[in-house]
From Swiss-Prot:
This is Trigger factor. The gene is tig. One of its GO terms (biological process) is cell division. The keyword Chaperone applies. One of its GO terms (molecular function) is peptidyl-prolyl cis-trans isomerase activity. Gene3D superfamilies: 3.10.50.40, Trigger factor ribosome-binding domain, Trigger factor, C-terminal domain. It catalyses: [protein]-peptidylproline (omega=180) = [protein]-peptidylproline (omega=0).
Length: 441
């Protein structure tokens, strides 16, 4: 079904297709095209020097007769720019971005009849009003008390600050740390292997690695190498290679001392008991943060379930490709699945990636709608703080001094997107609480 929009200068006809694809026919009045034609002539002739005329002062008629192709080309560009702007200002399905234009064609540029440009592009999705009355969240659970086991583990982690770390020549055993490097290469090809990571430290314990990964590196010594052939075509494609080589750079024995009052004072505590109190407060705050994140995740799921709309195909495909890559690489390199195990898991992983891609993209657009509908704002201080966070994630603690304008703009956009999403989801939580406490009719 086509829809039409118009004003004094443009008429826009839209044909909508699945995947937020829109075919648009934009027509201009003869008066506007005449104005654009004069602008095109003016731009061409400003650099033209003809005998008997000063630079840029030749009559329009001479310019048109001598440079017809240049004038036509410039006119078409101006017509396309004007028609593109009309998609948003006159029509109601604006393109996602200039890069979302799939095809553009000027089908008419006649001074007497006007101009016409046809576009095919991906548009922002059309989202109806959010049915807040359908939003329902479970009752927020009480924060669990900190257990003795959690306190003991926290104190043990603190004790590592004072630990002695000694590279040893013996074989590795449970509780040791190992320094690993991982490189990828291609069979039967010479060349320098590509590093995936270098000198990364792992603790040989079940809390920090899978049993399969740990088993590979128990009972080995520094200099040991583990080489694997990758059979999975997807993993080969992602890594641009089919041979994984793990190199054990060092086996490190870590001995942590007992904590006492003296060591507690070195950590800005008055005593060991004071350190334990501060640790408990820290663990309680972490527990509150985890609980809030659980509520946040529940709000995301609830919001995504109460409304549905069409998603832009290319954005969905890009997000699906990214998540598929991440899940398969995580299974192969982090969970350390064999090629056979990965093949058995692949179907489930692909389904997970598809569901996650749809949900996260849907939430991205919903968050922007909520942010605008609720008239939420981002303060300068909030933006600066989040830019610092994004900068540390990208560059570490010492960002480059000569950061480019493009990189700075990317940081601003990343920070703004993150804050927009967070504020929108906080609003979802607030609305859910309001709904839960409102008296029933």
């Amino acid at each position: 079904m086509s829809r039409n929009f118009s004003n004094e200068q443009f008429s826009v006809n839209l044909e909508e297709q699945p995947g937020c694809v829109v075919s648009a026919e934009v027509k201009t009045t003869p008066q506007l095209l005449d104005k654009l034609h004069k602008q095109a002539i003016k731009k061409i002739k400003k650099d033209v020097i003809l005998p008997g005329f000063r630079k840029g002062k030749a009559p329009d008629g001479i310019i048109v007769s001598r440079y017809p192709s240049q004038v036509t080309k410039e006119l078409n560009q101006l017509l396309i720019q004007s028609a593109y702007q009309a998609l948003a200002s006159v029509g109601d399905r604006r393109p996602l971005s200039p890069q979302a234009i799939k095809s553009t064609s000027v089908t008419k540029a006649d001074i007497n009849e006007g101009g016409q440009v046809n576009f095919t592009y991906e548009a922002f999705p059309t989202i109806s009003d959010i049915p807040w009355d359908k939003l329902s969240l479970s009752e927020e659970p009480a924060v669990k008390d900190i257990t003795d086991e959690e306190m003991e583990k926290g104190l043990q982690n603190i004790s590592y600050f004072f630990a002695t770390k000694t590279p040893v020549t013996r074989t590795s055993q449970e509780g040791d740390f190992i320094s690993l490097s991982l490189h990828v290469s291609k069979q039967n090809e010479e060349g320098v292997p590509t590093p995936i990571f270098e000198n990364k430290y792992f603790k040989l314990c079940e809390e920090e690695m899978t049993d399969a990964f740990k088993t590979k590196f128990l009972g080995i010594s520094a200099g040991h190498r583990v080489t694997e052939i990758i059979a999975s075509p997807e993993i080969q494609s992602f890594l641009n290679g089919d041979v994984l080589t793990f190199t054990v750079n060092a086996v490190i024995e870590v001995v942590a001392p007992e904590l006492d009052d003296d060591k507690a004072r070195q950590l800005q505590a008055e005593s060991l008991e004071d350190l334990k109190k501060k640790l408990r407060i820290q663990l309680e705050n972490q527990a509150k943060d985890r609980q809030h994140q659980q509520c946040f995740a529940e709000a995301e799921n609830a919001l995504a379930s109460i409304i549905d709309f069409d998603l832009p195909t290319s954005m969905l495909e890009d997000r699906l490709a990214m998540l598929t890559r991440a899940k398969l690489l995580n299974a192969r390199l982090i969970q350390y699945c064999s090629d056979e195990e990965l093949e058995n898991k692949k179907s489930d992983l692909l389904k997970e990636a598809e569901l996650e891609a749809k949900k996260t993209l849907k939430l991205f657009f919903l968050a922007n709608k909520i942010f605008n509908d609720e008239k939420l704002v981002i303060s300068r201080e909030e933006l600066q703080y989040m830019m610092d966070v994004c900068s540390r994630e990208r560059y570490g603690m010492q960002p480059p001094r000569d950061i480019s304008k493009e990189a700075l703009q990317e940081l601003v956009m990343a920070a703004r997107d993150r804050l927009t999403y967070h504020k929108a989801m906080e609003k979802v939580l607030a609305k859910a609480k309001e709904s839960a406490t409102a008296p029933s009719a």
